[in-house]
Amino acid sequence: MKLLPSVMLKLFLAAVLSALVTGESLERLRRGLAAATSNPDPPTGSTNQLLPTGGDRAQGVQDLEGTDLNLFKVAFSSKPQGLATPSKERNGKKKKKGKGLGKKRDPCLRKYKDYCIHGECRYLQEFRTPSCKCLPGYHGHRCHGLTLPVENPLYTYDHTTVLAVVAVVLSSVCLLVIVGLLMFRYHRRGGYDLESEEKVKLGVASSH
């Protein structure tokens, strides 16, 4: 319904323009006829210029039709722009203001930029406090604590058992070596004592 007045107005303007163009051509024809009736002599160059020939008339009619068609095309192709009412302008301003208020800056980017030591900062809008997502191996409110690796009890038990077995074997070897040395020394000392006794006996016998 809003488009109808603008379309009617454009059609009216097109009709007025076509009427003006047609009126000018009719006025020219009337002047030419009046000059011809007042001067019954054969038409001269000036009269020929006033009276349009058949080709000129056809060309004028085609020009008028083309002008009318162009005006009608422009009238139907152009879309009338809606009038900006104060209510629409206010609504547009409110929407722009709302969009500006909705975009809040993340406090983790400025205020709490260095809050998390070993982690990623995340601001909780509901509680209005920053929170940290710690990296693997760290814990704490600000990811400041280092988590030590926990040893496997089974692995610890196996390691201790191996050490104990190695210690027992080494101790046994040491004992065997010590016993062997003692036995070797005892046998060597016993042989030395026998030799000394024999020498003593031989010396006593020779003296007699």
Curated annotation (Swiss-Prot):
GO MF assignments: epidermal growth factor receptor binding; growth factor activity; heparin binding; receptor ligand activity; transmembrane receptor protein tyrosine kinase activator activity
Region Disordered, annotated ranges: 35-57, 80-104
Gene Ontology terms: cellular component: cell surface; extracellular region; extracellular space; plasma membrane
Domain EGF-like: 104-144
Domain of life according to the entry: Eukaryota
Biased composition (Polar residues): 36-51
Signal peptide residue numbers: 1-23
Propeptide: 24-62, 149-208
GO biological process: angiogenesis; blastocyst growth; cell chemotaxis; cell migration; epidermal growth factor receptor signaling pathway; ERBB2-EGFR signaling pathway; ERBB2-ERBB4 signaling pathway; positive regulation of cell growth
Chain positions carrying an annotated carbohydrate: T85
Disulfide topology: C108-C121, C116-C132, C134-C143
Tissue: Most abundant in kidney, skeletal muscle, lung, spleen, brain and heart.
Spans traversing the lipid bilayer: 161-184
InterPro entries: EGF-like_dom
Topological domain ranges for the Cytoplasmic compartment: 185-208
Subunit structure as annotated in this protein's UniProt entry: Interacts with FBLN1. Interacts with EGFR and ERBB4.
Known role: Growth factor that mediates its effects via EGFR, ERBB2 and ERBB4. Required for normal cardiac valve formation and normal heart function. Promotes smooth muscle cell proliferation. May be involved in macrophage-mediated cellular proliferation. It is mitogenic for fibroblasts, but not endothelial cells. It is able to bind EGF receptor/EGFR with higher affinity than EGF itself and is a far more potent mitogen for smooth muscle cells than EGF. Also acts as a diphtheria toxin receptor.
Full protein name: Proheparin-binding EGF-like growth factor
Species: Mus musculus
